[in-house]
Amino acid sequence: MASLKEIDTRIKSTKKMKQITKAMNMVSSSKLRRAEKNTKQFTPYMDKMQDAITAVAGASSNTNHPMLRPRKITRSGYLVITSDKGLAGAYSANVLKKLITDIEAKHQDSSEYSIVVLGQQGVDFLKNRGYDIEYSQVDVPDQPSFKSVQALANHAIDLYSEEEIDELNIYYSHYVSVLENKPTSRQVLPLSQEDSSKGHGHLSSYEFEPDKESILSVILPQYVESLIYGTILDAKASEHATRMTAMKNATDNATELIDDLSLEYNRARQAEITQQITEIVGGSAALE
């Protein structure tokens, strides 16, 4: 059995850790509320962008824009969104596991794909396993602005536009609820027919100048940038929710450990007192 001093030291250190995890839980909860608000505020913009895409691309059956035209896939592109920090449970690990599983199932060697990474966790994981990273960005704000991730989005889009890849897939953790997030993948390039016809098409009766192809060349890259940014906002909400849950579980576990250690301390203290009383009684009896 551990000594009273050792048990007391463990109780004190666990209490300090509990204070830290409780504070981190509260911080993550606050960040989650802001992330949910950011995602909600971004939705109307995406709806309007989809309306514009529907009006321009959906109204024209013979559009030939590269972002709307599937081509033979010889090289795939993967944009994976992970966190910069730890203490978020299996948030990054689940996304990376899904990515690696799909890459190993689809490709024979690294010449068949390119990887773009957001987040230090993803960079470290892939480098340690020998994967080549085409482009990476770390130290992304907890509440990212569009400007803060625009370079990443542009690089991924340029890979497709310059035909270095023939498709772009994004891997991330989709925020379902505070208690649930789902490792998800989706193809963002080429844009599917569904993507170009999701809007309500309120602009379809307009005449476009100079022509629809010229307009598509401007708004389609902006639309894909928006898809990527919206996905990053979704992933950030998932990250904050996962970290909040992880810190709550850590706090609960610390509370349980403190209770167990306190019980062990009291038992050890009682045993020590009992032994001291026994020794005193035994000494008194010997003197008689």
UniProtKB/Swiss-Prot annotation:
Any one GO MF annotation of this record: ATP binding
Annotated membrane topology: Peripheral membrane protein
Domain of life: Bacteria
Record has Metal-binding as a keyword: no
Database matches in Gene3D superfamilies: 3.40.1380.10, ATP synthase, gamma subunit, helix hairpin domain
Keywords associated with the record: ATP synthesis, Cell membrane, CF(1), Hydrogen ion transport, Ion transport, Membrane, Transport
Similarity annotation: Belongs to the ATPase gamma chain family.
The name this protein goes by in its record: ATP synthase gamma chain
Gene name linked to the record: atpG
